[in-house]
């Protein structure tokens, strides 16, 4: 029997929990990230199986939790092949038939299922719901809880992250702390730009690249997808948010946990003191640019001068904006957003620090 509900699927009082996964072994955001943290052994087995090409669309990859309380089974349901790609309805249809087989063969009494392929997967929820009802609706001996699309399961703040600091973790956490000290809220967008400017400062000081971030010219300026891994480690212990940081939108606010101020400061002044000059340079560089607009402007101009082969002139930078690699829509947005005075101010500041 199917029942529809909303909320946190991991709290469901059922024998089996369905976790939507890809076939490459990444649980980086949304409910999959929560599964990764709640059931680490499942993550280890699943990741190994992905390396061995054992996780495929249309087939459930099932592990047992071994817990006395809570669910017995974790049903890893592949809704994607690559984590960056969208789901396909045929993968949902085939997977539901394999899920049905599992429920019958194992005599499962209750199961909780998320909105398969909807949300991050890009599928239309009413279409997915119809497929679930068609495949499982006649299983009267199984209590099937269907969690409809909602942000509630994502908006559960992470209670704790890693405690061990590294130079990269300490530097990013300190950048966020300093930003708040200035009286400015710090968004995820701004952290991306701060990280870019820090990496550039480290380059200029000819120090070891502790961040190892792979930046690309994105919608709002330089963007590094792998920064999310670093932020996820800090999330819950050194940084806080109303939702999990990997699920946050560009303008969602991230703040520093002030209870960790002394610990971070001690680490930076001992193990990571080599990178303090780069941190100081970023603090001076962003003076007067402390806002989503200002940091996008500054980081975009810095990208064009350092990676886009532009000259430090207004005409050259504007031509670089016309050719912004993220696409015509985002190039036009930047040209509308940044006037000549803004651009010249940013050019002067970048040249002051990076000439």
From Swiss-Prot:
GO terms for biological process: peptidyl-glutamate ADP-deribosylation. It comes from the Bacteria. It catalyses: an N-(ADP-alpha-D-ribosyl)-thymidine in DNA + H2O = a thymidine in DNA + ADP-D-ribose. Residues 14-155 form the Macro domain. Residues 125-343 are annotated as: C-terminal domain. Residues 165-354 are annotated as: Interaction with DarT. ADP-D-ribose binds at residues 13-15, 20-22, 31-34, 79, 117-121. InterPro entries: ADP-ribose_metab_enzymes, Macro_dom, Macro_dom-like. It is an enzyme of class 3 (hydrolase). Its EC number is 3.2.2.-. SMART domains: A1pp. Signal peptide: none annotated. GO terms for molecular function: hydrolase activity. Keywords: Hydrolase, Toxin-antitoxin system. The active site is at residue 80. Belongs to the DarG ADP-ribosyl glycohydrolase family. Interacts (via C-terminus) with cognate toxin DarT; this heterodimeric complex neutralizes the toxic effect of DarT by preventing ssDNA binding to DarT and consequently inactivating the toxin by direct protein-protein interactions. The macro domain (residues 1-16 joined to 112-330) alone is able to de-ADP-ribosylate substrate in vitro and is almost as effective at neutralizing DarT in growth experiments as full-length protein. The C-terminal domain has no de-ADP-ribosylation activity, but is able to neutralize DarT mutant G49D and interacts with DarT mutant G49D. Antitoxin component of the hybrid type II/IV toxin-antitoxin (TA) system DarTG, which plays a crucial role in controlling bacterial growth and bacteriophage infection. De-ADP-ribosylates DNA modified by its cognate toxin DarT, which neutralizes the activity of cognate toxin DarT. Neutralizes DarT in vivo in 2 ways, by reversing the ADP-ribosylation via the DarG macro domain and by interacting with (and presumably sequestering) DarT via the DarG C-terminal domain. In vivo the macrodomain alone neutralizes DarT toxin from non-cognate T.aquaticus. The same domain de-ADP-ribosylates gDNA. This is DNA ADP-ribosyl glycohydrolase.
